[in-house]
Structures are given as structure tokens and as C-alpha cells.
Amino acid sequence: MATVAGDDGGGGGEFYLRYYVGHKGKFGHEFLEFEFRPDGKLRYANNSNYKKDTMIRKEVFVSPSVLREATRIIHESEIMKEDDSNWPEPDRVGRQELEIVMGNEHISFTTSKIGSLVDVQTSKDPEGLRIFYYLVQDLKCFVFSLINLHFKIKPIQS
């Protein structure tokens, strides 16, 4: 695992993150998945077969400061203190998976797709699921920004 040096609020040490959300339905297996790998590689995949779309795959290497920001987001969310035992089980609507390694802590969550905050509020563990819901929103925004910026910026010609 990679070592994330510096004061990231997350204790430094090893870091790995993987998020998946998807379902199998009318258009086949549709999903969004991204992971921050130990070597700094950010992998992103988005598969939608709607109107015969093809899978989008992107890979970029990110700097240690980007990894520090990801660990800060996770640490501040306090998701590492949560337990998914009272969260909705994956169903025909879909599933979400979140796996995180930070330092010597390793968590893995699995739950159903969350359509809105109403789904969160009516669950058996609204506080824990709310933390998960907002963390996932933050991580998606972070990853989409990194991927979009990386592939839209033109290199400087010398």
C-alpha cells in the first residue's frame, strides 16, 4: 500500500479507496466505479448501455497532495466509525460498495442504491447512512473534477 506522508488529518500511512454503484437491468450491467490505488493511480469506469453507449474508462496518476485531500475528506466524514449492519441490503434497484484502507484501519460497506435523503431518513440507521451518503457525494464530485480537469487541459507546447 502507498504511504501518504504529511499532516492529512487521517494519520498518514497506507491508503486505498474503491467505490462502486450499479445495477443489472433493462440495459444490462450499468455501473460507476472508481478507485485510488496505492501507487497513486486513480481508475474510473462508467458503463451505461442506455442508447447503446459504450463504457468510459479513464486512468490518471495523482499527486501525494491529492491523496492527502482524499484522506482528509474521509477522515472528516468519520465514516471509519460506522457499521453497515443496519443499512438496507442490496436489491434489484442496485448496490453500492465502499472499501477504504487508511493506516491500519480497513472498512468495507455494502448497501442498496440510495435514491434520495428520504431513503436515508427512513432507514434503520439514518445517522450512519447519512454520513455514507454525503461522503459518497463528496468523493464523486472530487473524482469527477479530477478526471474532467485532467482530460480537458491541453499540454503546454514549448
Curated annotation (Swiss-Prot):
GO BP, one annotated term: mRNA transport
GO molecular function ontology, one term from the record: RNA binding
Coiled coil: none
CDD domains tied to this protein: Mago_nashi
Alphabetical keyword list: Cytoplasm, mRNA processing, mRNA splicing, mRNA transport, Nonsense-mediated mRNA decay, Nucleus, RNA-binding, Translation regulation, Transport
Pfam families: Mago_nashi
Top-rank lineage group of the source organism: Eukaryota
Subcellular locations according to the entry: Nucleus; Cytoplasm
Induction of its expression: Induced by gibberellin, abscisic acid (ABA), auxin, brassinosteroid, heat shock, salt stress and osmotic stress.
GO cellular component entries: cytoplasm; exon-exon junction complex
InterPro entries linked: Mago_nashi, Mago_nashi_sf
Principal subcellular localization: nucleus
Role this protein plays: Core component of the splicing-dependent multiprotein exon junction complex (EJC) deposited at splice junctions on mRNAs. The EJC is a dynamic structure consisting of core proteins and several peripheral nuclear and cytoplasmic associated factors that join the complex only transiently either during EJC assembly or during subsequent mRNA metabolism.
Family to which the UniProt record says this protein belongs: Belongs to the mago nashi family.
Quaternary structure note: Heterodimers with Y14A and Y14B. Interacts with EIF4A3/RH2 and RH34. Part of the mRNA splicing-dependent exon junction complex (EJC); the core complex contains MLN51/CASC3, EIF4A3, MAGO and Y14.
The protein, known as: Protein mago nashi homolog 1
Organism taxonomic ancestry: Eukaryota, Viridiplantae, Streptophyta, Embryophyta, Tracheophyta
